[in-house]
Amino acid sequence: MAKFRVRVSTGEACGAGTWDKVSVSIVGTHGESPLVPLDHLGKEFSAGAEEDFEVTLPQDVGTVLMLRIHKAPPEAPLPLLSFPPDAWYCRWFELEWLPGAALRFPCYQWLEGAGELVLREGAAKVSWQDHHRTLQDQRQKELESRKDMYSWKTYIEGWPHCLDHETVKDLDLNIKYSAMKNAKFFFKAQSAFTELKFKGLLDRTGLWRSLREMKRMFNFHNTPAAEYVFAHWQEDAFFASQFLNGLNPVLIRRCRRLPENFPVTDEMVAPVLGPGTSLQAELEKGSLFLVDHGILSGVQTNVINGKPQFSAAPMTLLYQSPGSGPLLPIAIQLKQTPGPDNPIFLPSDDKWDWLLAKTWVRNAEFSIHEALTHLLHAHLIPEVFALATLRQLPHCHPLFKLLIPHTRYTLHINTLARELLIAPGKVVDKSTGLGIGGFSDLIKRNMEQLSYSVLCLPEDIRARDVGDLPGYYYRDDGMQIWSAIRSFVSEIVDIYYPSDASVRDDQELQAWVGEIFSEGFLSQESSGMPSLLDTQEALVQYVTMVIFTCSAKHAAVSASQFDSCVWMPNLPPSMQLPPPTSKGQASPEGFIATLPAVNATCDVIIALWLLSKEPGDRRPLGHYPDEHFTEEVPRRSIAAFQRKLIQISSGIRKRNQSLALPYTYLDPPLIENSVSI
């Protein structure tokens, strides 16, 4: 006879409790016990409850290895009646055989319908640490089950592969939005559509009548940052600052030599550079910077409301003023091939010529940001990380425990995006200048150029040579967060991987990395993405990159969308007239005629409003309410990580007090753990 106290914790979410009957068997080194019902008077397993059950086994099972949880509908009172099984969210089981001697079995999963679930004791273990055959078999069966549940598909040829489900209705509860988050998301969407339809804007296919009329749209849920954009969008210094701290802060690079297809001369830029210097001198000093949107050259464009749309592939040269002066644009060329029909626009040109040129650059920023920086780098690639984690790492694996909070809701939001945003005829196709055809072109082109170093912030900053560019808060805050994540990851890796050989010998880890390489990066060796990891250092770098991409990188390029775009002339999603081929032709009327139609503007701004702010049920970076790690040592590392994030946040908020436009997108409490919106 063996006696145990079993404590069960049910989640607090809406619908987490169950009327179903739950039984447990205990698996040990000497065998497995019969199923024992967890039952007492009254209802068990209510939402938020922790309940104790006394369990007596007929025989000793030896050292406890795992629990087998069985759930089934209650018996019907009449033979012809039956109860449909309902879902149950279990947080954990705890098994105590002596006072103070207890084992915790983390679950943090929904159990849908009738069936069973196996829970391991909470200590994290890599595969080579499991010596008992029962535990080895359990790891293998768990992964086989998850591979059946979560499979890959090709959505568009040349894109990273994705989850093979058509709609969010097909998803199981473990990867689906909570009921609260889902309700808030769709209420927010419906209220936005209703407001703009009431204003008579949502169905108008014509041009805006004036910038003044656009102000009606601007009042749509604007923010302090959006107010600043509205007040300063025409200013050169603000235009330049958006390359540093706007929604796409990843393109600007130092220019040591002018591209041959960008023939800027000393005479062109002398009014900005001033006397006593030259282009060559400033190139050598390192005070010139380049933003090149050349990947847009020749990209497929869209037709909106029956009208063809247009795109440019601009190059922008910027000058960092000496001392504490601002970064300023000094030359813009709208196409990649120089010639008489491709003038270089300058700040000294007519006001409307220069403003129109800058607006073409901002349209290019929209296209590259939405297709590449946001969709590809901050959604499709994190989906690969999430899906490979579910398929290749069992729950007891330390990397699963570390990474699973950073995959929360990613598969839901990406499936929803394929339903409502990037599917043919949906928002991207209806209302952006490139449409899904142009987005697809860009993603395929970028996949051929994408490198591992671009995903690793320190290497990316070095490659672009922007480590000392003043006022680059994305870099400053991002590097602090990267360092904090890396320190945390390094501590976790040191706990479970004592040597380089232990990394090489972890076959589950190698399968995880290999699947990311093949399914996400399409086995392109030119990307520099590892297909295996053979050192502790390589593992730390790789996992840091995964967590940073899924949290901070996504926050930086997602949360800023609405602020940048609600005043549409600052970030037009499409352009209805071709880029100018000469100077002196621009006018206020021509400027308005170039901007997107009213309905296209509304569609995009609603989408960006939804995608910029989390609709409740948030989990900020470093917030881990699901306690997958049960050992004291990794829990101390988590606490240290959380303290570091608080320190970083304090510094950011202190700095922001002195800024006219605070940079808040990488303030840790505002960063979500995962790509969930």
UniProtKB/Swiss-Prot annotation:
Show where the Lipoxygenase domain sits: 126-677
The record's annotation in PROSITE patterns points to: LIPOXYGENASE_1, LIPOXYGENASE_2, LIPOXYGENASE_3, PLAT
Q: Name one GO biological process term.
A: positive regulation of macrophage derived foam cell differentiation
State the SMART domains in the record: LH2
- One GO CC annotation, please? cytoskeleton
List ligand-binding residues for Fe cation: 374, 379, 554, 677
Spell out the molecular function terms from Gene Ontology.
Answer: arachidonate 15-lipoxygenase activity; arachidonate 8(S)-lipoxygenase activity; calcium ion binding; iron ion binding; linoleate 13S-lipoxygenase activity; linoleate 9S-lipoxygenase activity; lipid binding
Entry cofactors: Fe cation
Copy out the cofactor comment.
Answer: Binds 1 Fe cation per subunit.
What is the protein's name according to its record? Polyunsaturated fatty acid lipoxygenase ALOX15B
What gene name does this entry carry? Answer: Alox15b
